[in-house]
């Protein structure tokens, strides 16, 4: 309890979060729409936004200029605010945006979406998403696109490509009845980005869906990390890249195709944060285009093998779980244990368990007798009462 409130802990990604139980009940009573596992494999391509899909920060492409500020001074002030107050840098820029807009421009959701409409995109981005989805269809793979960004959701929703994404995870504002931004509704920083990978993995896409904590068998996971691609450009993407890498997924660093500055991707490659890097050129036939298509091809082949593996595993589990097979399984284990026994104490222990089983097939009796003949340690104690009694019962 905290100040009279009952708090409930739950795990979200790598975090433990405490929630007011009253709020928790309201959230958990809601029916969430979840994505279920399909018969075809699914590849999730997750993107940062600024300098990954767009050549510059979204705030620097209209908003900062509209409040009469310079890009460099805006970020200097915002980052200074964060440093002076031990404040999250993303909360600091959101606060700075609201404060600077006051008395100068309307700071509404519509205004932010209008700024987003002016955001420039890298070459090929506008046709990329459909083209890659269609390629997946040809290979028997479902391709889904997701945004995981510290930028503003409202601005991304104003871009030409907003409707191409299954879900946009980004920082956003709470608005009053007049549509004016009042307070952060969601803030996403470089570490909290990882929780959304778990949501994508399990199909629990709503940010309030506690189902992200549910246990899923490996074969029931909708999008395993091995089928995820993360495309980013900087340090803020490192936690997601590292997580995906650790589970055999694919992380791609991109750099501006005009400046050709590869310093960041070289550093990320050196630090084992990314597996590949390419220019942020999304046109057909580009390095990035060919790389992602190769990943889709590999996924199609690999998931066929995984499907066979899970079928075999399911058959084995089903076989072992049948009542008629439980004793057979126990007999098989004891026979193997006896064959591998290397001490008198161990042999006597195994014999005591074998004596409890009354029904042996001719083949099993033959196996047991062969073991006694070949294992010199067993052979030397054949006259011991328990061993002699057991083998006599096999006659």
Description of each model-found segment:
Residues 77, 81, 101, 302, ...:
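Surface-exposed polar/charged interaction patches
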């Amino acid at each position: 309890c905290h100040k009279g409130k009952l708090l409930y802990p739950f795990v979200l990604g790598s975090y433990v979060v405490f929630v007011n139980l009253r709020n928790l009940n309201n959230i958990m009573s809601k029916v969430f729409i979840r994505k279920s596992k399909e018969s075809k494999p699914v590849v999730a391509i997750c993107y940062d936004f600024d300098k990954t899909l767009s050549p510059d920060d979204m705030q620097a492409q209209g908003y900062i200029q509209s409040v009469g500020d310079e890009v460099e001074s805006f970020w200097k002030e915002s980052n200074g605010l964060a440093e002076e107050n031990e404040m999250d840098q993303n909360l600091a820029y959101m606060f700075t945006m609201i404060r600077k807009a006051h008395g100068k421009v309307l700071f509404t959701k519509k205004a932010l979406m209008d700024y987003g409409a002016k955001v420039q995109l890298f070459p090929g981005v506008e046709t990329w998403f459909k083209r890659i989805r269609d390629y997946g269809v040809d290979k028997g793979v479902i391709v889904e696109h997701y945004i995981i960004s510290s930028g503003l959701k409202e601005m991304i929703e104003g871009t030409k490509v907003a409707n191409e994404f299954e879900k946009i995870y980004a920082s956003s504002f709470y608005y009053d009845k007049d549509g004016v931004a009042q307070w952060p509704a969601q803030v996403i920083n470089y570490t909290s980005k990882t929780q959304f990978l778990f949501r994508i993995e399990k199909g629990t896409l709503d940010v309030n869906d506690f189902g992200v904590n549910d246990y899923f068998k490996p074969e029931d996971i909708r999008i395993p990390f091995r089928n995820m691609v993360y495309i980013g450009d900087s340090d803020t993407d490192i936690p997601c890249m590292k997580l995906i890498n650790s589970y055999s997924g694919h992380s791609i660093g991109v750099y501006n195709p005009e400046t050709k500055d590869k310093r960041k991707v070289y550093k990320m490659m050196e630090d084992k944060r990314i597996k590949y890097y390419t220019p942020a050129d999304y046109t057909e036939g580009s390095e990035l285009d060919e790389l992602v298509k190769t990943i889709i091809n590999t996924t199609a082949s690999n998931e066929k093998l995984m499907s066979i593996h899970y079928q075999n595993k399911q058959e084995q589990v089903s076989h072992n779980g049948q009542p008629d097979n439980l004793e057979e399984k126990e007999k098989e284990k004891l026979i193997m244990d006896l064959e591998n026994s290397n001490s008198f104490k161990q042999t006597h222990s195994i014999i005591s368990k074998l004596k409890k089983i009354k029904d042996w097939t001719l083949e099993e009796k033959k196996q047991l007798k062969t073991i006694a003949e070949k294992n010199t340690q067993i052979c030397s104690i054949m006259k011991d009462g328990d061993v002699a009694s057991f083998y006599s019962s096999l006659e």
